From Swiss-Prot:
ATP binds at residues 39-46. Residues 431-593 form the Helicase C-terminal domain. The beta-hairpin motif is involved in DNA binding. The lineage of its organism: Bacteria, Pseudomonadati, Pseudomonadota, Gammaproteobacteria, Enterobacterales. HAMAP family: UvrB (MF_00204). This is UvrABC system protein B. GO terms for molecular function: ATP binding; ATP hydrolysis activity; DNA binding; excinuclease ABC activity; helicase activity. It comes from Yersinia pestis bv. Antiqua (strain Antiqua). GO terms for biological process: nucleotide-excision repair; SOS response. Residues 631-666 form the UVR domain. It is found in: Cytoplasm. Belongs to the UvrB family. The UvrABC repair system catalyzes the recognition and processing of DNA lesions. A damage recognition complex composed of 2 UvrA and 2 UvrB subunits scans DNA for abnormalities. Upon binding of the UvrA(2)B(2) complex to a putative damaged site, the DNA wraps around one UvrB monomer. DNA wrap is dependent on ATP binding by UvrB and probably causes local melting of the DNA helix, facilitating insertion of UvrB beta-hairpin between the DNA strands. Then UvrB probes one DNA strand for the presence of a lesion.
Length: 671
């Protein structure tokens, strides 16, 4: 029986939180399909959502617009629910180049990808948790709308082992091979098994810290035990165990054979169409490529690019929605769309980009038309599949407002009593010199400044100018990778420099309580960077500081500026009235620095001897590494760890294990 959610927090709901929690729960219990939580920056939206999840006790999926915010949410949810299953589901590609054809230059680009094993393990862990228990929170990126294995086939492939079960060793080994586990008696790692006499050790694909030992006696399962794969130490015995497939895309042999026959029929039909249109080159290319794939599938059970035949492998009809993570979420599940004004348009845009690339491949004979069904969900399909949904944003979009029927749940008053920033509009003519004097005032009292410009060129020039005039300044732009971006934000908070200049990167989800001033240059130039929503989000970056202030430089007040200023002043007035009524004195936030990089660390390892008692490994020397270099370092340390274990030097191996664990958490946060 699955346990209930248990929320761990030193805080109690305060400000607008209790009312928001009550209204959200009331709406969900009354069967409302869509609700919108308009929560200002720093009002504790994540804490409100965590309370709703804990009170209603329903499996939940949280959709975030990017990996950085997903990692931040995952870390926060792990702290709120350390005793429950908090899982992480994002794209497992470190690098991905889809196959494509460029007709103008007659260039075919082969698919090339690099899979991150640790994130793959976390994805498998997420689906396992959804299938086995109800106290689950899965934090996902838009990767959740892409095709996954069919839950029914995935469940059918599982290997159930029970103490006392009559089964011979060969049958277990054959079933493990069908699940795509490989035998490796030398190096015991995730997704492998080893055999020693009548003992089979299995390292589950969804685990990174424990393995299963199956002990047989005369074709009977005598004992099932969980053990530490590194030290070999037995932890406890279990009466039964389910081994899940190594990949979501595993398919039974009979289904593969059936799919092959269906592919042959489609190939024959497509060849006739191409020949009728005198496309001889395309016909030859398609026949050659498809026949090769069919031979590979017959011999090995899979082929390169097998996902292009997913319609047949999953038994779907033409145009049917692909199976996704949403198919694993129970019918009474809950969906939270974080920063919905960004996430919802993303979901709508994924299908169209994918479709145009594949249509070219089909037209020129690189793929069968059925490859078009290997795709992300369409927006209508997402709407049809989504369970009860809460949209969370400081600036909800039109879609969320329409779906919620205009009935918005506001969370404007912060538990800390902090007010929205004061806003001033100043002329453009003197904006740079005026900004420089404001920076000097802030730097003198150890506060930070964010500056947002319209173009990359302007950001670079401004950075040079401020630097020449003695300001400690850095520039954040799209060419900087995620790890560097996290490092720059961390350095800003630590006071390594005082001013951060950016274009469109200083918006959703960046928690920087040290920032007391946000300067928006050329605020009167209407456009998506200076829309009402963008302005409110950017102004909100100063809302976590006691002295928060926003300066908008413009020679006129545009409609967007007027709306953004009006909305901010409305919120500020409401917050002020609440504070005066209850005699609340605003308090500054004291958020730990490096939260994202320390992803999920408070829950370091489970129970049992030696697990939770290890000292925190020192990984500071690796914090400046790029994702690629960090991945290489993890592999090196893992190789050393296994060498120590084989030499029975378990203390050194355990130290490296903890170090690897922390570096993996860091890798997730920055990739």
């Amino acid at each position: 029986m699955s346990k209930s959610f248990k929320l761990h927090s030193v805080f109690k709901p305060a400000g607008d939180q209790p009312e928001a929690i009550r209204k959200l729960e009331e709406g969900l219990e009354n069967g409302l399909a869509h609700q919108t939580l308009l929560g200002v920056t720093g009002s504790g939206k994540t804490f409100t959502v965590a309370n709703v999840i804990a009170d209603l006790n329903r499996p939940t999926m949280i959709l975030a617009p990017n990996k950085t915010l997903a990692a931040q949410l995952y870390g926060e949810m792990k702290e709120f629910f350390p005793d429950n299953a908090v899982e992480y589901f994002v794209s497992y590609y470190d690098y991905y180049q889809p196959e494509a054809y460029v007709p103008s230059s007659d260039t075919f680009i082969e698919k090339d990808a690099s899979v991150n094993e640790h994130i793959e393990q976390m994805r498998l862990s997420a689906t396992k948790a959804l299938l086995e228990r109800r106290d689950v929170v899965v934090v996902a990126s838009v990767s959740a709308i892409y095709g996954l294995g069919v839950p029914d086939l995935y469940l059918k492939m599982m290997l159930h082992l029970t103490r006392g079960m009559i089964i011979d060793q060969r049958s277990i080994l054959r079933r493990l091979s069908e699940l795509q586990y490989s035998r490796n008696d030398q190096v015991f790692q995730r997704g492998t098994f080893r055999v020693r006499g009548e003992v089979i050790d299995i390292f589950p694909a969804e685990s990174d810290e424990w393995a299963l030992r199956v002990e047989l006696f005369d074709e009977e399962v005598e004992r099932l035990s969980i053990f530490d794969p590194l030290t070999g130490q037995l932890q406890h015995e279990v009466p039964r165990f389910t081994v899940y497939p190594k990949t979501h895309y595993v398919t039974p042999r009979e289904r593969i054979l059936q799919a092959m026959e269906e592919i042959k029929v489609e190939l024959a039909e497509r060849r006739q169409v191409l020949l009728a249109n005198n496309k001889l080159l395309e016909e030859q290319r398609l026949s050659q490529r498809t026949q090769f794939d069919l031979e590979m599938m017959n011999e090995l059970g899979y082929c390169s690019g097998i996902e292009n035949y997913s319609r047949y492998l999953s038994g779907r009809g033409p145009g049917e929605a692909p199976p996704t993570l949403f198919d694993y979420l129970p019918a009474d599940g809950l969906l939270i769309v974080d920063e919905s004004h960004v996430t919802i348009p993303q979901i709508g845009g994924m299908y169209k980009g994918d479709r145009s690339r594949k249509e070219t491949l089909v037209e020129y004979g690189f793929r069968l038309p059925s490859a078009l069904d290997n795709r992300p969900m369409r927006f209508e399909e997402f709407e049809a599949l989504a369970p009860q949904t809460i949209y969370v944003s400081a600036t909800p979009g039109k879609y969320e407002l329409e779906k919620s029927g205009g009935d918005i749940i506001e969370q404007v008053v912060r538990p800390t009593g902090l007010l929205d920033p004061l806003i001033e509009v100043r002329p453009v003519a003197t904006q740079v010199d005026d900004l420089l004097s404001e920076i000097r005032i802030r730097a003198a009292i150890n506060e930070r400044v964010l500056v947002t410009t319209l173009t990359k060129r302007m950001a670079e020039d401004l950075t040079d100018y401020l630097s020449e005039h003695g300001a400690k300044v850095r520039y954040l732009h799209s060419d900087i990778d995620t790890v560097e971006r996290v490092e720059i934000i961390r350095d800003l908070r630590l006071g390594e420099f005082d001013v951060l200049v950016g274009i469109n990167l200083l918006r959703e989800g960046l928690d920087m309580p040290e920032v007391s001033l946000v300067a928006i240059l050329d605020a009167d130039k209407e456009g998506f960077l200076r829309s009402e929503r963008s302005l409110i989000q950017t102004i909100g970056r100063a809302a976590r500081n006691l002295n928060g202030k926003a300066i908008l430089y413009g020679d006129r007040i545009t409609a967007s500026m007027e709306k953004a200023i009006g909305e901010t002043e409305r919120r500020r007035a409401k917050q002020q009235a609440y504070n005066e009524e209850r005699r609340i004195i605003p308090q500054g936030l004291n958020k730990k620095i490096g939260d994202i990089l320390q992803l999920g660390q408070p829950s370091m390892r489970g129970k049992g001897k030696g697990r939770g008692s290890h000292k925190m490994a020192d990984t500071t020397q690796y914090q400046s590494l790029s994702p690629k270099a960090l991945d290489q370092k993890i592999r090196e340390l893992e190789a050393k760890m296994y060498t120590y274990a084989q030499n029975l030097e378990f203390e050194q191996a355990a130290e490296l294990r903890d170090q690897v664990h922390q570096l993996r958490q860091q890798f997730i946060a920055i990739s």
